[in-house]
Amino acid sequence: YFAISGSGPGILAEFLASALNVQAMLWRTSPSATELEEVTLGWLRQLMGLSESFEGVIYDTASIASLHALAAARQRAVPSVRVHGLAGRTDIGPLRVYTSEQAHSSIDKAVMTLGLGQDALRKIPVDEDFRLRPQALRSAIAADLKSGITPLAVVATVGTTSTTSIDPI
């Protein structure tokens, strides 16, 4: 069971988000929303018993969070992509994103949107409980490294939409 934005709490959250109508990602553009986000993340940090170094950003959907996480991974792997992009680049080799066969379709979409291409996404086989098989992941990464492919990210799933399976993270 997954709560949706059409649930009671979801409707209230959507109401508040639309009423604020801000991007809280930068203090400069929206100081009050950024402060609210910091307080909320502090509560989450306390509830989960995480260290003070835990930081984050609140997104409206998991799809956007995945897109931004993969964009950050791409930026870290190829810092010049921000200025020069990926098109026609001969100075970087192929990049690879790994995820399970049960991953949400937003991962496919993010890989395409970020200009990595569908060939950059490797879907790892799952076990009988629909969880990513760690040994298959290790083998895929080793084979790619041997072939000159740079691992960019591993996207684990915590509760697939079809089976609620959780990858062994």
Segments predicted by a language model, with ranges:
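A generic secondary-structure signal for well-formed alpha-helical elements
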Residues: 23, 44-48, 73-80, 162
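Conserved beta-loop-alpha segment that forms the PLP phosphate-binding cup at the N-terminus of a helix
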Residues: 37, 41, 55-86, 106-111
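Cysteine-centered functional microenvironments
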Residues: 20, 24, 52-56, 122-126, ...
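PLP-dependent aminotransferase-class I/II
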Residues: 78-85, 89-151, 156, 163
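N-terminal entrance/gating region of PLP-dependent enzymes' catalytic architecture
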Residues: 1-53
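Catalytic PLP-binding core of fold-type I/II PLP enzymes
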Residues: 165-169
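Generic hydrophobic alpha-helical segments
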Residues: 44, 69, 73, 137-141
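Short acidic-aromatic active-site loops that bind/stabilize oxyanions
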Residues: 25-37, 59, 63, 96-100, ...
